[in-house]
């Protein structure tokens, strides 16, 4: 991983799977997690599969827009968007919308390894010039932070939903592969998630 110059010189390179396990350990039972494509949702599936998890399949850049929709539709539910840096670069417009409407129940976690990992490790703009925390702050998400280390991540996650607006955390991570493979069944994923949010009906898919 090649890291750009960012306004956080003490940031450590962390492991995505470990951070995901720490995130899952902090979840309350009713919180929804929308995970972006590839290793981001593979690690979430491995760390703790639950009906409130939504795993993206091929829709790069849509974790934040979907999480925003859930947060606005169910304002009493905590919602977390778990996204990679390459995917968030495809959805920068969504950050401006989040910065404008400021849903206090939304947390965004960006795993930044500076590459498009599952397509061949091509270099992303985050490895050269783009600072996603600075971009988020510029978009109006004032409570945006680089994660310094694993303990700092847990501390920041513990105070999510306590402030008056959304929280965005970005972590520099290594390029280790995913720790599991999410079942690629869109209907099953959708139905379980709807059931987890209390909006779906009982189905044969709820195995």
Each language-model region and where it sits:
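Glycine/aspartate-rich loop-and-adjacent alpha/beta segment that forms the canonical ThDP
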Residues: 1-7, 14-18, 29, 50, ...
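Active-site diphosphate/adenylate-binding microenvironment
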Residues: 2-60
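Conserved thiamine diphosphate
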Residues: 3, 123-159
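General beta-strand structural signal in soluble alpha/beta enzymes
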Residues: 33-37, 55-58, 81, 145-148, ...
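Glycine-rich beta-alpha junction loops
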Residues: 37-40, 113-115, 172-178
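Thiamine diphosphate
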Residues: 43-112
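Short acidic, glycine/serine/threonine-rich loops at helix termini
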Residues: 44-47, 119-123, 180-184
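Active-site-proximal loop->helix
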Residues: 93-101, 118-135
């Amino acid at each position: 991983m090649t890291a750009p110059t960012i306004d956080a010189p003490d940031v450590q390179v962390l492991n995505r799977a470990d951070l995901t396990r720490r995130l899952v350990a902090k979840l309350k039972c009713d919180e929804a997690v929308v995970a972006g494509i590839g290793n981001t949702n593979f690690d979430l599936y491995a760390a703790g599969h639950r009906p409130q998890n939504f795993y993206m399949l091929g829709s790069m850049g849509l974790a934040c827009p979907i999480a925003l929709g859930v947060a606005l539709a169910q304002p009493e539910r905590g919602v977390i968007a778990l996204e990679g840096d390459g995917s968030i670069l495809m959805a920068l417009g969504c950050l401006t919308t989040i910065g404008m409407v400021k849903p206090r129940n939304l947390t965004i976690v960006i795993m930044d390894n500076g590459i498009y990992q599952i397509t061949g490790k091509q270099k992303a703009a985050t490895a050269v010039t783009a600072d996603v925390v600075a971009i988020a702050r510029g978009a109006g998400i004032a409570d945006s932070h680089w994660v310094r280390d694993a303990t700092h991540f847990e501390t920041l996650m513990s105070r999510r939903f306590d402030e008056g607006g959304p929280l965005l955390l970005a972590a520099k991570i290594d390029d280790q592969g995913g720790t599991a493979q999410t079942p690629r069944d869109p209907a099953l994923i959708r139905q379980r998630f709807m059931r987890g949010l209390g909006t779906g009906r009982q189905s044969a898919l709820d195995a």
